[in-house]
Amino acid sequence: MNEKIAILSAYSFVNIEEPANLIPKLLLIGKRKYVRGTILLANEGFNGSFSGSYENVNLVLEELIKLTGPKDVNVKINYSDVHPFQKLKVRLKKEIVAMNVDDLNVDLFKGEYIEPKDWDEFITKQDVIVIDTRNDYEVEVGTFKSAINPNTKTFKQFPAWVQQNQELLKGKKIAMVCTGGIRCEKSTSLLKSIGYDEVYHLKGGILQYLEDTQNKNNLWQGECFVFDDRRAVTDDLSPVERHWLQR
């Protein structure tokens, strides 16, 4: 029986002084361990998704943590019969998730986590609004029943949507959701920076929610778009091979 391929996703908002210096080291260990995927590095932290054997993806993660020294790392592991990535890439970026807002310190200034097991109860409260921070083409594939779709084509458009919808957000508890946690975490930092106090986000994102809850209350509708060769997954995290999505 063939060993399942582990798909490890990890991110952390942590100050990295010279991220370019880490690229050769990560490429070296990743290629030695036959790991494929993408790791993004920036001064604000790292964001990676890569596949290989369970042992090897964890060795690459250990090296990434050793080189960057974060206090907290958000880690998610799924499994597949095949590699969802073609090769290993380590890239230097201005931001690990591009919002185009300067001087956000997400490491120190962000909203509160809501655990997946508590999410359904929280978002059905009358004073809570749910915002799906993903792009429109992702939301069309699947989202939460009550979620607001900002209809953005890129995450860089999200700050403008917030500015244009302050009356909608006023006086509400704001719950943010995204695929794996990184965009909603950065979104909470944006809202906190402009004066919103009660800001929350789904810990681990949609993928962790589906794994932990199996969508038992049917608040999630549709499938979840993912940024690899699987294209989308069902609420039991099985690949949806029919997906055609164009970005």
UniProtKB/Swiss-Prot annotation:
Q: Which UniProt keywords apply?
A: Oxidoreductase, tRNA processing
Q: Which GO terms describe its biological process?
A: tRNA modification
- What are its E.C. numbers? 1.14.-.-
> Which reaction is this enzyme known to catalyze?
uridine(34) in tRNA + AH2 + O2 = 5-hydroxyuridine(34) in tRNA + A + H2O
Pfam families linked = Rhodanese (PF00581), UPF0176_N (PF17773)
Q: Where is the active site?
A: C178 (cysteine persulfide intermediate)
Every copy of the Rhodanese domain together lies at 124-218
Q: Does the keyword Aminoacyl-tRNA synthetase apply?
A: no
The kind of enzyme this is, by top-level EC class, is oxidoreductase
Check the record and name the CDD domains matching this protein: RHOD_YceA
What are the recorded GO MF terms, alphabetically? Answer: oxidoreductase activity, acting on paired donors, with incorporation or reduction of molecular oxygen
tRNA processing as UniProt keyword: yes
Give the family per the record: Belongs to the TrhO family.
Matching HAMAP family, A to Z? TrhO
The function of this protein is: Catalyzes oxygen-dependent 5-hydroxyuridine (ho5U) modification at position 34 in tRNAs.
What protein is this chain from?
tRNA uridine(34) hydroxylase
Q: Which organism is it from?
A: Rickettsia massiliae (strain Mtu5)
Lineage at the top is: Bacteria, Pseudomonadati, Pseudomonadota, Alphaproteobacteria, Rickettsiales
